[in-house]
Amino acid sequence: MKLTMLGTANSAMVPVYGCDCSVCGAAREDSNLRREKSSAYLEHNGKFLLLDANAPDLMCRFPAGLIDKILLTHYHMDHVHSLFDLRWGAGDKISVISPDDPLGCDDLYKHPGILDFSLRAQAFKSFDWQGITITPLPLNHSKLCLGYCFEFDGKRLAYLTDTVGLPKQTERWLKEFPVDWLITDCNYSPIEDPQARASLNHNDFHHILDIDETCRPTNLGLIHVSHHMLGWAEQHPQAFSERLRILNDGEEITL
């Protein structure tokens, strides 16, 4: 199975509109440094499973018939907005598997078009896609949110966004079933103020170190990064390693 990162930034993307910091300036000059909103796709047996649906070129990148299913982490707009265009397509239905959020996002449930929202993922209740076992894992976020662990041929990859820390039951699961890759959001550089940390809705780098120590993944990849986090990373290269690093748009992980 192969996972490809469609985007690795937070909702502001990189470069941030109107920002003249060094990270955003470099991204304007070099398109390879640009980052779209975090999402990915899994490729296996010639089929494609989208993880969230926010890529600006989604319908061009995946022509009709190429998307087998869509797997949503949650219904915040920055993770689903491409569905609002995709739903008005023609042809076969596309199944969208999502957390059992009764509100969804705006009028997607009311006017689904070619999208089928009838399948709901439940925490720790595994299901199969193309021979890959997918286990939904609860996350800590302001909207009902699930990460997903993909297992094939003895290898595991966990895609866990959006979250601030991990629920205890998810930590226990990841300790019982160690993963080769854990991919999660790191929106913030280390925040020292306890009050500020208590109000977070995404991981800071302290959370990443805690997750690493508790869950002990073989590799830990960071996504949903802000331009501030990227600037901090440039100034603190010693905080990263070959096994703990920020992922890039277009990066592929094959297991």
What are these regions (language model features)?
Residues 1-61, 145-161, 181:
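Conserved beta-strand hairpin/beta-sheet module of binuclear metal-dependent hydrolase folds
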Residues 3, 74, 134, 148, ...:
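Divalent metal-coordination and catalytic microenvironments
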Residues 8-9, 53-55, 75, 139-141, ...:
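Active-site metal-binding loops of divalent metal-dependent hydrolases
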Residues 60-64, 127-130, 170-176, 255:
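Short amphipathic alpha-helix with an adjacent loop that forms part of the alpha/beta core around
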Residues 93-146, 151-153, 244-253:
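Metallo-beta-lactamase
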